Amino acid sequence: MFQGASSLSLDAKGRLSVPTRHRDVLSATAGGQLTITKHPHGCLMVFPRPEWEKFRERIAALPMSAQWWKRVFLGNAMDVEMDGTGRILVSPELRAATGIVRDTLLLGMGNHFELWDKATYEAKEAEATQGEMPDVFQDFAF
């Protein structure tokens, strides 16, 4: 459903303009309603509300041994809605938790997006691509 990378800037109020190519899909499939939460790799996950509900149910069903991860995902989730110009507000708490100040990278990851501080993503990608590829790619043809 969602793919590709977009370099975006937050405005002074912490709002992000969703790229035009994604707005129509988000309006049609989620009524412009999204949920943003933390990702364990230091970015944010941005879900269309129906996809969030599926993810939330899976997380909520985890055993007590995963209680802290439930807190990370569910306790930090914030519901947002695209405004008339396609902007969403990224809360100060979520921005602070991920180091997002202004320059960001929005990555389409299939059924959701990842929102990264641009410099953080570039550093992590450079580090990952300098190392060996995971074994799961051993039989993968490029």
From Swiss-Prot:
Any Gene Ontology CC annotation: cytoplasm
Assembly and interaction partners: Forms oligomers.
Source organism (scientific name): Variovorax paradoxus (strain S110)
Cited Pfam families: MraZ (PF02381)
Keywords: Cytoplasm, DNA-binding, Repeat, Transcription, Transcription regulation
Name listed for the protein in its UniProt record: Transcriptional regulator MraZ
Record's subcellular location: Cytoplasm, Nucleoid
Keyword DNA-binding: yes
Annotated CDD domains: MraZ_C, MraZ_N
Any one GO molecular function term: DNA-binding transcription factor activity
Domain of life: Bacteria
GO biological process: negative regulation of DNA-templated transcription initiation
